[in-house]
Amino acid sequence: MNKSRIDKQNEVYNFIKLQIKEKGYPPSVREICKAVGLSSTSSVHFHLKRLEKEGLIKRDSSKTRAIEIVDPTSKKEVINVPIVGTITAGNPILAIENIEDVFPLPIDYVKNTKDLFMLKVSGESMIEAGILNGDLAIIEKTDSANNGDIVVALIDNEATLKRFFKESSYIRLQPENKSMKPIILENCKVLGRLVGIYRKY
Protein backbone atom coordinates (compact mmCIF):
# COMPACT_ATOMS: atom_id res chain seq x y z
CA MET A 1 0.00 0.00 0.00
CA ASN A 2 1.40 3.42 -0.91
CA LYS A 3 2.01 6.17 1.63
CA SER A 4 -1.08 8.22 0.76
CA ARG A 5 -3.32 5.18 1.28
CA ILE A 6 -1.62 4.38 4.60
CA ASP A 7 -2.11 8.00 5.72
CA LYS A 8 -5.78 7.87 4.71
CA GLN A 9 -6.23 4.54 6.50
CA ASN A 10 -4.77 6.10 9.67
CA GLU A 11 -7.19 9.03 9.29
CA VAL A 12 -10.12 6.61 9.06
CA TYR A 13 -8.93 4.67 12.11
CA ASN A 14 -8.32 7.81 14.21
CA PHE A 15 -11.72 9.25 13.27
CA ILE A 16 -13.47 6.03 14.32
CA LYS A 17 -11.62 6.07 17.67
CA LEU A 18 -12.45 9.75 18.24
CA GLN A 19 -16.11 9.28 17.37
CA ILE A 20 -16.48 6.32 19.74
CA LYS A 21 -14.71 8.22 22.53
CA GLU A 22 -16.77 11.41 22.12
CA LYS A 23 -20.19 9.99 21.23
CA GLY A 24 -20.07 6.45 22.54
CA TYR A 25 -20.85 4.86 19.17
CA PRO A 26 -19.01 4.47 15.84
CA PRO A 27 -19.58 6.67 12.79
CA SER A 28 -21.49 5.62 9.68
CA VAL A 29 -19.64 4.96 6.43
CA ARG A 30 -20.93 8.25 4.99
CA GLU A 31 -19.76 10.15 8.08
CA ILE A 32 -16.29 8.65 7.63
CA CYS A 33 -16.38 9.69 3.95
CA LYS A 34 -17.11 13.29 4.88
CA ALA A 35 -14.66 13.46 7.80
CA VAL A 36 -11.59 12.18 5.95
CA GLY A 37 -12.38 13.60 2.51
CA LEU A 38 -13.09 10.41 0.57
CA SER A 39 -15.35 10.70 -2.45
CA SER A 40 -17.02 7.28 -2.33
CA THR A 41 -18.26 4.80 0.25
CA SER A 42 -16.39 2.03 -1.57
CA SER A 43 -13.11 3.75 -0.63
CA VAL A 44 -14.16 3.72 3.03
CA HIS A 45 -15.08 0.03 2.80
CA PHE A 46 -11.61 -0.65 1.35
CA HIS A 47 -9.92 0.99 4.34
CA LEU A 48 -12.26 -0.71 6.82
CA LYS A 49 -11.38 -4.11 5.32
CA ARG A 50 -7.67 -3.31 5.65
CA LEU A 51 -8.08 -2.21 9.28
CA GLU A 52 -10.04 -5.37 10.04
CA LYS A 53 -7.41 -7.54 8.35
CA GLU A 54 -4.71 -5.89 10.48
CA GLY A 55 -6.70 -6.68 13.63
CA LEU A 56 -7.34 -3.03 14.53
CA ILE A 57 -11.14 -3.14 14.25
CA LYS A 58 -13.98 -5.67 14.27
CA ARG A 59 -17.10 -5.32 12.11
CA ASP A 60 -20.51 -6.92 11.85
CA SER A 61 -21.57 -6.64 8.21
CA SER A 62 -25.20 -7.36 9.09
CA LYS A 63 -25.51 -4.16 11.13
CA THR A 64 -24.95 -0.47 10.47
CA ARG A 65 -22.39 1.41 12.58
CA ALA A 66 -21.14 -1.97 13.88
CA ILE A 67 -17.45 -1.07 14.11
CA GLU A 68 -15.49 -1.94 17.24
CA ILE A 69 -11.95 -0.86 18.09
CA VAL A 70 -9.88 -3.88 19.13
CA ASP A 71 -8.14 -3.46 22.48
CA PRO A 72 -4.40 -3.44 21.65
CA THR A 73 -3.60 -5.39 24.83
CA SER A 74 -5.66 -8.30 23.51
CA LYS A 75 -2.99 -8.88 20.86
CA LYS A 76 -0.16 -8.92 23.39
CA GLU A 77 1.09 -12.00 25.17
CA VAL A 78 -0.37 -12.17 28.66
CA ILE A 79 0.19 -14.12 31.86
CA ASN A 80 -2.66 -15.15 34.14
CA VAL A 81 -1.91 -13.68 37.56
CA PRO A 82 -4.01 -14.93 40.50
CA ILE A 83 -6.03 -12.34 42.40
CA VAL A 84 -5.80 -13.31 46.05
CA GLY A 85 -8.63 -11.76 48.03
CA THR A 86 -8.64 -8.12 49.08
CA ILE A 87 -5.88 -6.30 50.95
CA THR A 88 -6.54 -3.28 53.11
CA ALA A 89 -4.38 -0.19 52.60
CA GLY A 90 -5.74 1.29 55.80
CA ASN A 91 -6.86 -0.76 58.78
CA PRO A 92 -5.68 -4.34 58.22
CA ILE A 93 -8.29 -7.02 57.54
CA LEU A 94 -8.00 -10.79 57.75
CA ALA A 95 -5.76 -12.06 54.96
CA ILE A 96 -7.75 -14.03 52.39
CA GLU A 97 -5.57 -16.79 51.03
CA ASN A 98 -7.91 -18.31 48.46
CA ILE A 99 -7.61 -17.30 44.81
CA GLU A 100 -10.70 -15.30 43.87
CA ASP A 101 -9.92 -14.87 40.18
CA VAL A 102 -7.11 -14.63 37.64
CA PHE A 103 -6.13 -11.48 35.74
CA PRO A 104 -4.66 -11.53 32.20
CA LEU A 105 -1.72 -9.16 32.67
CA PRO A 106 0.26 -8.08 29.55
CA ILE A 107 3.65 -9.78 29.80
CA ASP A 108 5.54 -6.53 29.15
CA TYR A 109 3.86 -4.87 32.15
CA VAL A 110 6.33 -6.40 34.63
CA LYS A 111 9.99 -7.45 34.48
CA ASN A 112 9.61 -10.71 36.38
CA THR A 113 6.68 -12.91 35.37
CA LYS A 114 7.26 -15.59 38.01
CA ASP A 115 5.83 -15.75 41.54
CA LEU A 116 3.33 -12.94 41.07
CA PHE A 117 -0.06 -12.42 42.62
CA MET A 118 -2.47 -9.50 42.76
CA LEU A 119 -4.44 -7.97 45.59
CA LYS A 120 -7.24 -5.44 45.40
CA VAL A 121 -6.45 -2.31 47.42
CA SER A 122 -9.08 -1.01 49.82
CA GLY A 123 -8.55 2.24 51.70
CA GLU A 124 -6.46 5.39 51.47
CA SER A 125 -3.36 4.81 53.58
CA MET A 126 -1.09 4.66 50.49
CA ILE A 127 -2.54 7.51 48.44
CA GLU A 128 0.63 9.64 48.62
CA ALA A 129 2.48 6.80 46.88
CA GLY A 130 -0.13 6.93 44.11
CA ILE A 131 -1.89 3.76 45.29
CA LEU A 132 -5.63 4.32 45.28
CA ASN A 133 -8.69 2.54 46.56
CA GLY A 134 -9.74 -0.12 44.03
CA ASP A 135 -6.30 -0.50 42.43
CA LEU A 136 -4.91 -3.96 41.77
CA ALA A 137 -1.53 -4.25 43.48
CA ILE A 138 0.92 -6.50 41.62
CA ILE A 139 2.99 -8.36 44.20
CA GLU A 140 6.14 -10.43 43.77
CA LYS A 141 6.35 -13.22 46.34
CA THR A 142 9.30 -12.73 48.69
CA ASP A 143 9.91 -13.07 52.42
CA SER A 144 12.46 -10.25 52.62
CA ALA A 145 12.46 -6.52 51.90
CA ASN A 146 14.79 -3.54 51.74
CA ASN A 147 14.13 -0.31 53.58
CA GLY A 148 11.69 1.79 51.59
CA ASP A 149 10.08 -1.13 49.74
CA ILE A 150 6.29 -1.26 49.68
CA VAL A 151 5.37 -4.69 50.99
CA VAL A 152 2.49 -6.94 51.88
CA ALA A 153 3.07 -7.70 55.56
CA LEU A 154 1.27 -10.25 57.70
CA ILE A 155 0.57 -9.14 61.25
CA ASP A 156 -1.24 -11.62 63.52
CA ASN A 157 -2.76 -13.31 60.46
CA GLU A 158 -3.82 -9.97 59.01
CA ALA A 159 -2.40 -8.50 55.81
CA THR A 160 -1.61 -4.88 55.06
CA LEU A 161 0.18 -2.88 52.36
CA LYS A 162 2.75 -0.45 53.77
CA ARG A 163 6.25 0.92 53.22
CA PHE A 164 8.81 -1.21 55.09
CA PHE A 165 11.58 0.13 57.34
CA LYS A 166 13.80 -1.99 59.60
CA GLU A 167 15.02 0.22 62.43
CA SER A 168 17.64 -0.68 65.06
CA SER A 169 15.25 -2.48 67.42
CA TYR A 170 11.90 -2.63 65.63
CA ILE A 171 10.14 -2.70 62.25
CA ARG A 172 8.16 0.32 61.08
CA LEU A 173 5.37 -0.12 58.56
CA GLN A 174 4.80 3.38 57.24
CA PRO A 175 1.57 4.48 55.54
CA GLU A 176 1.82 6.97 52.68
CA ASN A 177 -0.81 9.24 54.16
CA LYS A 178 0.20 12.05 56.50
CA SER A 179 -3.00 11.68 58.53
CA MET A 180 -2.14 8.09 59.52
CA LYS A 181 0.40 6.81 62.03
CA PRO A 182 3.00 4.10 61.37
CA ILE A 183 2.65 0.57 62.70
CA ILE A 184 5.55 -0.30 65.03
CA LEU A 185 6.37 -4.00 65.51
CA GLU A 186 9.10 -6.15 66.96
CA ASN A 187 8.74 -8.45 63.97
CA CYS A 188 6.43 -9.20 61.06
CA LYS A 189 6.20 -11.63 58.16
CA VAL A 190 6.71 -10.20 54.66
CA LEU A 191 4.56 -11.95 52.04
CA GLY A 192 5.68 -9.99 49.01
CA ARG A 193 6.95 -6.77 47.49
CA LEU A 194 4.97 -4.35 45.33
CA VAL A 195 6.22 -4.33 41.73
CA GLY A 196 3.36 -2.55 40.00
CA ILE A 197 -0.15 -1.16 40.10
CA TYR A 198 -2.91 -1.85 37.60
CA ARG A 199 -5.71 0.68 37.42
CA LYS A 200 -8.75 0.80 35.19
CA TYR A 201 -9.98 4.25 34.18
Curated annotation (Swiss-Prot):
CDD domains: HTH_ARSR, S24_LexA-like
Ranges in a coiled coil: none
Similarity comment: family membership: Belongs to the peptidase S24 family.
Functional note: Represses a number of genes involved in the response to DNA damage (SOS response), including recA and lexA. In the presence of single-stranded DNA, RecA interacts with LexA causing an autocatalytic cleavage which disrupts the DNA-binding part of LexA, leading to derepression of the SOS regulon and eventually DNA repair.
UniProt-listed GO biological process terms: DNA repair; DNA replication; negative regulation of DNA-templated transcription; proteolysis; SOS response
Protein name: LexA repressor
Signal peptide: none
Origin species: Clostridium botulinum (strain Hall / ATCC 3502 / NCTC 13319 / Type A)
Gene3D superfamilies named in the record: Umud Fragment, subunit A, Winged helix-like DNA-binding domain superfamily/Winged helix DNA-binding domain
